[in-house]
């Protein structure tokens, strides 16, 4: 397969999900590399498949999807212009031309018209039951939908989705060694709830 452009996506780091945050343009709010690795494990990108990243932010999940194979494609939807601009920069720097497209869209108003049907969908923030219900019928048999959240409201939503629709529900946290004065300790990140659903019929 054709190599992906730029060293961060190829020889130095390979294509395994979890590219360090320093390689992305972002405003400080970015899905951390360990959380991205968990998300991509659930999304299971396959060659030639199309991915929707809803509320793409810096586009880090979509970039990771595209890095797995040159034929993978992604569409990222983002409401905030500054974050959409960062996502476009990351698409240009870390994916092949035409592999990752970013669309300015307010998902509170629903999905924009004309989107091609995806093989997998990720909602990393701002998930609602209505948005989930819009996405589910667009997936093919075997398509994957993954929702992440860090708020109590998101946790209540995914618990409801899990009760109503099944799927897998996990909650996990990541702690990083950090300096405490002259000593060291563990600095926890926000706990993430993650719901994964696969269409079977």
Which residues does each PLM region occupy?
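Helix-to-beta-strand junctions that scaffold the AdoMet/dcAdoMet cofactor pocket
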Residues: 69, 96, 139-141
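S-adenosyl-L-methionine
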Residues: 77-120
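C-terminal substrate-binding/active-site "lid" region of AdoMet-derived donor-dependent transferases
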Residues: 132-193
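Active-site segment flanking the S-adenosylmethionine/decSAM binding pocket
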Residues: 102-147
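Conserved SAM-binding loop of SAM-dependent methyltransferases across substrates and taxa
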Residues: 58-70
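Short beta-strand element of Class I
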Residues: 71-75
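Conserved S-adenosyl-L-methionine
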Residues: 55
């Amino acid at each position: 397969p054709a190599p992906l452009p730029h060293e961060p996506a190829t020889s130095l780091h390979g294509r395994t999900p979890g590219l360090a945050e320093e390689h992305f343009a972002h405003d400080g709010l970015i899905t951390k590399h360990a959380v991205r690795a968990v998300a991509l494990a659930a999304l299971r990108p396959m060659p030639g498949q199309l991915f929707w990243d809803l509320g793409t932010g810096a586009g880090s999940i979509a970039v990771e999807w595209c890095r797995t194979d040159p034929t993978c494609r992604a569409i990222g939807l983002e409401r905030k212009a500054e974050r959409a601009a960062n996502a476009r920069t990351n698409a240009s720097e870390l994916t092949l031309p035409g592999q990752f497209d970013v669309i300015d869209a307010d998902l509170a108003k629903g999905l924009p018209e004309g989107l091609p049907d995806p093989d997998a969908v990720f909602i990393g923030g701002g998930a609602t039951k209505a948005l989930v219900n819009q996405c589910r019928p667009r997936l093919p048999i075997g398509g994957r939908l993954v929702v992440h959240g860090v708020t109590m409201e998101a946790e209540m939503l995914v618990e409801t989705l899990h009760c109503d629709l099944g799927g897998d529900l996990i909650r996990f946290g990541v702690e990083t060694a950090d300096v405490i004065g002259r000593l060291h300790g563990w600095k926890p990140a926000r706990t993430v709830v993650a719901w994964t659903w696969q269409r079977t019929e």
